[in-house]
């Protein structure tokens, strides 16, 4: 079938023959189909969606467009976590070495930030020398030596996704559940993971604004991943408030290191343990959820996870001095505070506004080729439920450009809501989704 016929079928919301869809994707990855035709197809998909079989076929074809990794020679199978992105989400930096220190094998292929949500690679690159461009051979060596690696997608790993991701970014076709599903899963499956835990976020600081949107995406990814032979589970987590107390690249690395040293914020530790327990269960570590969390707690508070992170940083070329003494990480030239306008209790923190303030300061990028400022952002965020007196600091703002400071300060100041009545934060983890509890209208395997 010629490309324009496939595009027309999707435009008219008709089913595409699966062999033709697969050939279309593989031809695009080889350069035989131009960007303008794939852009038209992506827009038609964004408008009309895909059925389950089409989504599964798209995912498999994108995975098969390049090389695939295999870790079958290791005693345990490879397991990973993927987050749909949020404000202050530095979980991967803590989770990968934590699970590895409990016997897991974690080859984590991560991405860069775009817009308000930060990228794991940008955060790690605030450690001088840290390499995020490992080849497949280098990746395997790091995993073999320390049990975990956090690196970027290579040109040979799911290249169809790499091309389509860049195209979606500039054609208004990001918000499509089938395209998001195929993008995430093709990379993870190509990286050789046999177990995957998804952190699907909802709320003001995430891509999916409602629980319903997050659930649809989570259920689709669980169903497609399971069909592809991967054990997949998802947690729906609240991103109406920032995660932890810091937003920004080096600031989040600092907080992650402190967490690995046993001094992290409670919400970050809670989410890390929840995801880590599911990863350990997938690789066959015996025990119920409480037992697995206890194993993770022992690895964290004994220092084993920190030592594993330090080893990973060394193996990937990073200077360990910046981990052993994280105060050496890049710092901003100006640090200011946001004072509380009145006394009471903090009852809300708008994650989107906090993320936008950090973005204005230079912590994020508008275009993929833009540079980020590692040093800027927001730290020492007060959290929901905490008491404040008038004039108390609600957050510290870290800036290098004076022209951005005032705009960010005003935006950040408007993100806090104080009331005389005490209010506890809503539950961080909304629900768990597995292949056994998918909605009736989800096509399972």
How does the language model describe each region?
Residues 5, 10, 15-18, 28, ...:
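Well-ordered secondary-structure scaffolds
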Residues 109, 143, 151-153, 184, ...:
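Short beta-strand segments
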Residues 47-48, 93-107, 187-192, 227-228, ...:
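Alpha-helix C-terminal capping segments
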Residues 77-116:
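Glycine/serine-rich anion-binding loops at beta->alpha junctions
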Residues 1-88, 260, 308-319, 444-445:
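Acidic, glycine/proline-rich low-complexity segments that act as flexible tails and inter-domain linkers
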Residues 123-149, 219-229:
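A glycine-rich helix N-cap at a beta->alpha junction
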Residues 92, 110, 117-122, 153-154, ...:
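Short acidic, glycine/serine/threonine-rich loops at helix termini
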Residues 144-193:
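Phosphate/diphosphate-binding glycine-rich loops and adjacent basic-rich segments that engage nucleotide
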């Amino acid at each position: 079938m010629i490309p324009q016929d496939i595009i027309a079928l999707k435009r008219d919301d008709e089913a595409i023959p699966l062999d033709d869809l697969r050939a279309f994707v593989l031809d695009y990855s080889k350069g035989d189909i131009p960007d303008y035709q794939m852009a038209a197809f992506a827009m038609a998909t964004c408008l009309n969606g895909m059925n389950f079989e089409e989504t599964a076929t798209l995912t498999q074809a994108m995975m098969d467009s390049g090389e695939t990794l295999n870790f079958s020679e290791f005693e345990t199978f490879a397991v990973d976590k993927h987050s749909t992105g949020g404000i202050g989400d530095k979980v991967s930096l803590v989770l990968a070495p934590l699970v590895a220190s409990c016997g897991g094998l974690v080859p984590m292929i991560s991405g860069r930030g775009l817009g308000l949500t930060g990228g794991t690679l940008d955060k790690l690159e605030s450690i001088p020398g840290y390499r995020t461009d490992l080849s497949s051979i280098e990746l395997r060596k790091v995993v073999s030596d320390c049990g975990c690696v956090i690196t970027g997608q290579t040109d040979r790993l799911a290249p169809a996704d790499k091309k389509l991701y860049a195209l979606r970014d500039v054609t208004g076709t990001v918000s499509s559940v089938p395209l998001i599903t195929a993008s995430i899963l093709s990379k993870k499956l190509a990286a050789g993971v046999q177990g995957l835990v998804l952190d699907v976020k909802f709320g003001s600081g995430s891509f999916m604004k409602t629980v319903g949107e997050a659930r649809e995406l989570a259920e689709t990814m669980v169903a497609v991943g399971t069909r592809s032979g991967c054990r997949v589970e998802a947690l729906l987590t609240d991103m109406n408030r920032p995660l932890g107390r810091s937003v920004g690249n080096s600031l989040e690395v600092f907080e992650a290191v402190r967490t690995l040293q046993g001094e992290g914020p409670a919400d970050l530790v809670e989410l890390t343990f929840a995801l880590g327990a599911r990863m350990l269960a997938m690789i066959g570590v015996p025990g119920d959820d409480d037992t697995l969390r206890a194993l993770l707690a022992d690895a964290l508070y004994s220092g084993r996870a920190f030592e594993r992170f330090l080893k990973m940083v060394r193996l990937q070329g990073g200077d360990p001095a910046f981990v052993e003494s994280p105060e050496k990480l890049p710092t901003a030239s100006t640090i200011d505070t946001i004072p509380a306008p009145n006394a009471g209790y903090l009852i809300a923190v708008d994650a989107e506004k906090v993320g936008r303030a950090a973005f204005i300061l230079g912590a994020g990028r508008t275009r993929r080729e833009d540079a980020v400022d590692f040093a800027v952002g927001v730290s020492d965020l007060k959290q929901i439920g905490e008491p404040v007196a008038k004039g108390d600091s609600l957050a510290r703002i870290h800036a290098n450009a004076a022209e951005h400071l005032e705009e960010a300060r005003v935006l950040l100041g408007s993100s806090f809501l104080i009331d005389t009545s005490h209010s506890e934060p809503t539950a961080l983890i909304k629900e768990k989704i597995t292949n056994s509890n998918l909605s009736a209208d989800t096509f399972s395997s």
